[in-house]
Amino acid sequence: MSVDLDITGGVARVTINRPERMNAVDLATAARLEAIWQQIEGDPSVRCVVLSGAGEKAFSAGADMKSGDKAKSGVQYWADGNPMGFGGITFRDTLKVPVIARVNGFALGGGMEMVLGADIVIAADHARFGLTEARVGRLPLDGGMVLLQRLIPRNIAAGMMLTGRMVPAAEMARYGLINAVVPAPELDAEVDRWIADITACAPLSLRAIKAMMRRTAQMSAREAAGARLPELIEALNSEDQHEGVAAFNEKRAPVWKGR
């Protein structure tokens, strides 16, 4: 399989497994990713997703330009559109659980666009990030051009895209894109710490928070505060919101049911 999926203990680990191609995404890999996202969306046991690339060199180098797939022209690719973004994740608003990008190396082009679709980014200190499309005569069409400038200072985003430069993880952390940068041997332990904290929270609360953040980002604060999203109402009416208060008062760990 070009992408591996393991679901254990409520955590779905999605690993692009093409290390010989720097985990670049060809048509078959893109189709496999889409099938995986749909499977996860239909599995209520999943509480968190970890997206990574196999090996130690690359998270993903983006589109596989040597795959042998019938190539589209740039304008054909743009005209066809990709509503979910690169790898089916950049713009995906139907995946309601937190997504961690475990960045174990280069995240370039579409690989970086997948990072932009994550909720939390954990990177090894040797990781490098870049929207390098202009260096091969293409554009960051699957989310890079519109999202990067919303997530880091505009002039920094412009500098990256207008030069195609690759930026070290520590620098991207200073710009606010990365939650944690750790030495490579500590990457999995750091990811596990984030998973533990996420799964300690009520699942419906996290779904509501993610939905509110995603869907109200372009609203005024007053408009956003007044949004009545279904996920918000579900969380506020859930058994878990009673369980959380009871557990706090009884000085015990809550037992979440996700309902």
For the regions a language model picked out, list residue spans one by one.
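C-terminal alpha-helix plus adjacent terminal tail
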Residues: M1-A12, D43, E56, S67, ...
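Conserved CoA-thioester-binding segment of acyl-CoA-metabolizing enzymes
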Residues: M1-E56
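A generic local structural motif
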Residues: M1-S2, E34-Q38, M84-T90, L116, ...
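Terminal peptide-recognition signature
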Residues: V14, R18, L33, L51, ...
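An acidic, glycine-rich surface segment that forms the CoA-thioester-binding/catalytic face
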Residues: A30-R32, Q38-E41, M65-N104, V136, ...
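Short, active-site-adjacent cap segments at secondary-structure transitions
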Residues: E56-S60, L108, G130, M213
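Crotonase-fold acyl-CoA enzyme core
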Residues: F91-L204, I233, N237-S238, H242-A246, ...
